[in-house]
Amino acid sequence: MTDLSEKVRAWGRRLVVGAAAAATLPGLIGIAGGAATANAFSRPGLPVEYLQVPSAGMGRDIKVQFQSGGNGSPAVYLLDGLRAQDDYNGWDINTPAFEWYYQSGLSVIMPVGGQSSFYADWYQPACGKAGCSTYKWETFLTSELPQYLASNKGVKSTGSAAVGISMSGSSAMILAVNHPNQFVYAGSLSALLDPSQGMGPSLIGLAMGDAGGYKADAMWGPSSDPAWQRNDPSLQIPALVGNNTRLWVYCGNGTPSELGGANMPAEFLENFVRSSNLKFQDAYNAAGGHNAVFNFNANGTHSWEYWGAQLNAMKPDLQSALGASSGGGG
């Protein structure tokens, strides 16, 4: 076979994969906001508070679910998926995360809302099917919220962790890149880790349109805008390595296990994002990174059962990295 024939065949494969993704991804990428799992919500009686935190940047109060790890405790920010709801954070809807982390010495913080936001400061108003609002989520998470928690709840404003799923996995890493003193730990579960590359911007735009009717251009401008590169974890590896950020990176392969998640959307999407995670690991190692856990299991779909299992497995690592004192809180 000639070199030209090989190139044509390779281009054809890319076009087929791209077309399939473009047709399928809009309804899939936000699956993280779907129906609750059988293990949804923590048991009653836990000291979970529902805070209304003022945000000058967004011009409204933001609901935050909070469980204290004790005075002076480090914080774990659990970030939601693309279809984040306005009533509860997806981690609470779909897992007993508060129960898992009760008396762990870690304050658990779940911001509520932010559908399709990527937890970013958007260029323009976020206009969707429900109307327009201001999205300045990075400002909220890195300035307004930590100041409020330090002043009112005794939570450390530095040495924290950000853990995200799907949409917010890349957000967790970018928060650590941009705010290394606040976020010394970033957990990314089943995220697309090269969003600026290839068809990434187009597919993200389609998915955001499906999840609330939002436009990616309002977030970071056209795909040629440098904001896309600034928010691409695969291009920010030198900063993550240089800051010695502790990373926990997970992605399944689209094959369900006994945990569940056996449905076509969850299987397709997990398999779709896996390659970006494998490439990220290779680039991280090549850059001299040595402070990461990579879990690329021989099973796992794009669903809460697997993300919950990872959050459970992550707890001792979080406690060690953040210097938490077990038994704190409650």
Curated annotation (Swiss-Prot):
The keyword Secreted applies. It comes from Mycobacterium intracellulare (strain ATCC 13950 / DSM 43223 / JCM 6384 / NCTC 13025 / 3600). This is Diacylglycerol acyltransferase/mycolyltransferase Ag85B. Its main location: secreted. InterPro entries: AB_hydrolase_fold, Esterase-like, Mycobacterial_A85_antigen. Residues 98-108 are annotated as: Fibronectin-binding. Keywords: Acyltransferase, Disulfide bond, Secreted, Signal, Transferase. Disulfide bonds join C127-C132. One of its GO terms (molecular function) is diacylglycerol O-acyltransferase activity. Belongs to the mycobacterial A85 antigen family. The antigen 85 proteins (FbpA, FbpB, FbpC) are responsible for the high affinity of mycobacteria for fibronectin, a large adhesive glycoprotein, which facilitates the attachment of M.tuberculosis to murine alveolar macrophages (AMs). They also help to maintain the integrity of the cell wall by catalyzing the transfer of mycolic acids to cell wall arabinogalactan and through the synthesis of alpha,alpha-trehalose dimycolate (TDM, cord factor). It is an enzyme of class 2 (transferase). Residues 1-40 form the signal peptide. The active site is at S166, E270, H302. Substrate binds at L82, R83, S166, D194, F272, V273, R274, S275, K279, H302, S303, W304. The keyword Secreted applies. One of its GO terms (cellular component) is extracellular region. The gene is fbpB.
